[in-house]
Amino acid sequence: MSSTKPFAIAKRSVWEAYQQVKANRGAAGIDEETIAMFEQDLSKNLYKLWNRMSSGSYFPPPVKQVEIPKAKGGTRKLGIPTVSDRIAQTVVKRIIEPVLDPIFHPNSYGYRPGRSAKQAIAVTRKRCWQYDWVVEFDIKAAFDQIDHGLLLKAVRSHIKERWILLYLERWLTAPFETPGGEQVLRQRGTPQGGVVSPILMNLFMHYTFDLWMHRNYPQCQFCRYADDAVVHCGSQEQAQNVMQAIASRLSECGLMMHPEKSKIVYCKDSNRTQSYPHVHFTFLGFTFCPRKAISNTRRIFTSFLPGVSADALKKMRAAVRGWRLNRQTHVALAALAKLYNPIICGWWNYYGAFYPTAMLDLCMHIDRALERWARRKYKTLSGRLRAGVQWLRKMKDAEPQLFHHWRLIGTKVG
C-alpha cells in the first residue's frame, strides 16, 4: 500500500472482497465479463481496481438493467453491476456493515448477518397469536424511490471516511443501461441487485420507519424485511390510525404506500370469531390465515398460521416443469434424485418449516412429473396412466428415502 495514495485502502481488502464475490457467483454486468474471464488476469485486474479506488479515480460503470417478471404481473427492475464493481462495492460493504448493523432495530430482519426470513416468519406467527389485528403494507418501488439526499444524510451521521462517502454517492448516481443500450441517469433510488443496496435500504428504512415506529407507536410490534413489513395492533381502530400514519410518514420521506396492496387484516381463529373481510395476508412467501391445527390432546381447532403462499407454489411448480423430465428418459431415477434433491430440499427447508401440509400440493406435482417421465421411459407403461402411478408407488416402497419429499410426506399438520 503506497503512502502517496489519497485514500488508505489495503490491498488485502480488495483481495478478500474478490473472494467473497467469487463465492457468491452472480451474472455478468454490461461488459459481459464473467468471474472466470476476470480471473484470466486476476492480479492485474485487482491491482487496477485497488489503484483507482485508493487514488479516488474509480468511477462505477453503468449498471445493467434486467427486468424480472412478478408473480402477479408487471416487472421488477434489477441492477446488475460488473464483476469489478461488485468487488469495489464489497470492499465498502465489509467496512460499513459492522458500523451500521448494530444500530438497526431488532425487528429488522432483511439482509442482516445472523438474521433470516424464517426468523421473521417465526416471530410474526407468534405475534399474530398475541395481537388481533395486522397492518400489511407494500411500498411502491421502494428501492427505486429512495431519496438520495435523505439517505446520504443518514450515511454521513455514521460513516466518516471520505472515500466511502465519495464512492457511495457515485454508486447512487451511476446510470442504468437498458436492454436496448440506452443509459438512464438516476436522481433517486439504489439499484436492487447492487452489493451495497440492501444495507443502504436498511439504513434508509431504519430512520424512515423502524425508529419512527419505535418512538411513535411503541405499543405496536412490527417486523420488517427490507421493504416488506407488517405491524401488529390491538384493535381495529388502532390499526386504522397506524396505517394512515404510516402512509403519511412514507410520503414525507419520498415513498408511497401501495393502495391496492396494503390492508388491515383480522387474525381470525377458534377464539377470535369476529366477521371481517380480510383474514389473510402474505409475507415473505407465506400466507398467514385461519388453518386447521391439532392440539397436543389431538383436538382439531382453527389457528392463525403461516403456510406456503399460492404464488410461491406456482413458482415452484413452474420450476419443476422447467426441469423437462420427459426429455431426460436416458437418465436413471436415482440420477434424477441426485440432481434435483438439493432444490427440493431447499424448498422444504424454507417453505416446509411452517405448516408443511401446505407443501403436499408440490409433492404431488413432482410425483406426477415423475410418473410422466416413467411412462415415457418405459414402453410397458406408455399410455397407461394407472400403471405409471403404480410404478411410482413401488419405487417409493422400495426406496422411501430416494427423493427428499418422499421422506417428509408423513410430516404432521401445523
Residue spans of the language-model regions?
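Non-catalytic, polymerase-adjacent accessory regions of viral genome-replication enzymes
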Residues: 1-43, 47
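Core structural elements
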Residues: 9, 60-66, 71, 172, ...
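Conserved polymerase palm-domain catalytic core
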Residues: 52-67, 71, 103-268, 280
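Duplex nucleic acid-engaging cores and interfaces of nucleic-acid transaction enzymes
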Residues: 84-88
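A conserved non-catalytic segment of reverse transcriptases
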Residues: 173, 253-328
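A glycine-rich phosphate-binding loop feature that marks nucleotide/adenosyl-phosphate handling sites
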Residues: 225, 262-270, 340-343, 361-367, ...
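Non-catalytic, peripheral interaction segments enriched in hydrophobic/basic residues
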Residues: 336-381
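Extended C-terminal regions of large enzymes
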Residues: 365-369, 374, 378-414
